[in-house]
From Swiss-Prot:
Gene Ontology CC, one term: cytosolic large ribosomal subunit
Protein name (Swiss-Prot/TrEMBL): Large ribosomal subunit protein bL25
GO BP field: translation
Subunit structure as annotated in this protein's UniProt entry: Part of the 50S ribosomal subunit; part of the 5S rRNA/L5/L18/L25 subcomplex. Contacts the 5S rRNA. Binds to the 5S rRNA independently of L5 and L18.
Membership in a protein family: Belongs to the bacterial ribosomal protein bL25 family. CTC subfamily.
Origin organism lineage: Bacteria, Pseudomonadati, Pseudomonadota, Gammaproteobacteria, Pseudomonadales
Pfam families for this protein: Ribosomal_L25p (PF01386), Ribosomal_TL5_C (PF14693)
Species name: Pseudomonas entomophila (strain L48)
SUPFAM superfamilies for this protein: Ribosomal protein L25-like (SSF50715)
Signal peptide (from-to): none
């Protein structure tokens, strides 16, 4: 059982023109795939999906998707937003199958930022989400990045983070130890020091 429920209708009218007509009627196109079943094109009421994803946790939780009354558990795989206005234009969902791993993007929560700031550091968040691979039951709501012990000059990489039990960082599994955040000296101070040295 999930706290996140979304209603949808099967869609047969496909193509760019059809998608445009959908958006004009306050609906959005979507697709659900995976789980050894055919991909299915969907129509979702724009207001419903916008309301659901006002809650950040919906991005990293199992969603009960009701397609014409038939229920299936899914996670959001990708979402396309309007570049200027930010509203949702299209969504991709993946069916959840018990015992099978899925990949999903999970939000990053930064904590302990006060400590490096007090030491004169400025913090740059390099990522806002991390792609993980795990079973649906292990899908974390977010990944916590603790900056309380970070010094000026510190770069936090994926390998510095503790993955929750049963969870794997996709980039790290492919040998890509991405930077997540860094603590650097304030730019103004650095420029002043450079000027004094000249």
């Amino acid at each position: 059982m999930t706290d996140f429920i979304l209603n949808a209708q099967a869609r047969t009218d496909l193509g760019k023109g059809a998608s445009r007509r959908l958006r004009h009627s306050a609906n959005i196109p979507a697709v659900v795939y995976g789980g050894d079943k055919e991909a299915q094109s969907l129509t979702i009421v724009a207001k419903e999906i916008a309301k659901l994803f006002e809650n950040e946790a919906a991005f990293s939780h199992v969603i009960e998707l009701n397609v014409d009354g038939a229920k299936q558990n899914v996670v959001v795989k990708a979402m396309q937003r309007h570049p200027a206005k930010g509203f949702i234009m299209h969504a991709d969902f993946v069916r959840v199958v018990a015992g099978q791993k899925l990949t999903a993007k999970v939000p990053v929560h930064f904590v302990g930022e006060e400590a490096p700031i007090k030491k004169g550091g400025e913090i740059s968040h390099v990522v806002s989400e991390i792609e993980v691979s795990c079973e649906a039951k292990d899908l974390p709501e977010f990944i916590e990045v603790d900056l309380s012990k970070a010094e000026v000059g510190t770069i936090i990489h994926l390998s510095d983070l503790k993955a929750p039990k049963g969870v794997e960082f996709v980039a790290l599994a492919h040998g890509d130890d991405k930077a997540v955040a860094n603590v650097h000296a304030p730019r103004v101070a650095a420029e002043a020091a450079e000027g004094a040295a000249e």
